[in-house]
């Protein structure tokens, strides 16, 4: 379920980038906000409970699975914080697009980290559910 949700979020982010390229800033911001909201739901409803249920798998911190999961969760937390901050900044002053332009580099870092985190999440999924 989470992998499907992450694919939907990726599609939403793709549409948001397309809206930005078409100079539709309001649509871009709304789509990004929707993506962050879905990501927040996925973290709270799926990822955190899943992580908490893996206690036995994560007890040995020096295994590749545990290290990969920790890096994935850490990057995911950073992405979530950056995304929420970016959306909150936009929501606090929707009429001033210049403030958003000033955060362009933070947006780029956020999307790069999110894509990295997504790839790591796919590896975690493969390690859990595909035969070795």
Give the residues covered by each predicted segment.
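Alpha-helical membrane insertion/targeting regions
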Residues: 1-132
């Amino acid at each position: 379920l989470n992998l499907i949700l992450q694919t939907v979020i990726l599609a939403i982010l793709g549409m948001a980038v397309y809206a930005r390229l078409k100079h539709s800033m309001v649509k871009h911001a709304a789509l990004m906000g929707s993506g962050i909201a879905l990501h927040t739901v996925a973290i709270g409803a799926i990822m955190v409970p899943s992580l908490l249920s893996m206690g036995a798998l994560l007890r040995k911190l020096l295994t590749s699975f545990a290290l990969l999961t920790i890096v994935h969760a850490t990057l995911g937390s950073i992405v979530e914080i950056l995304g929420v901050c970016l959306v909150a900044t936009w929501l606090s002053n929707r009429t001033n697009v210049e403030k958003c332009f000033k955060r362009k580099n933070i947006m780029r870092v956020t999307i790069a980290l999110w894509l990295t985190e997504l790839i790591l999440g796919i590896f975690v999924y493969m390690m859990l559910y595909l035969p070795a």
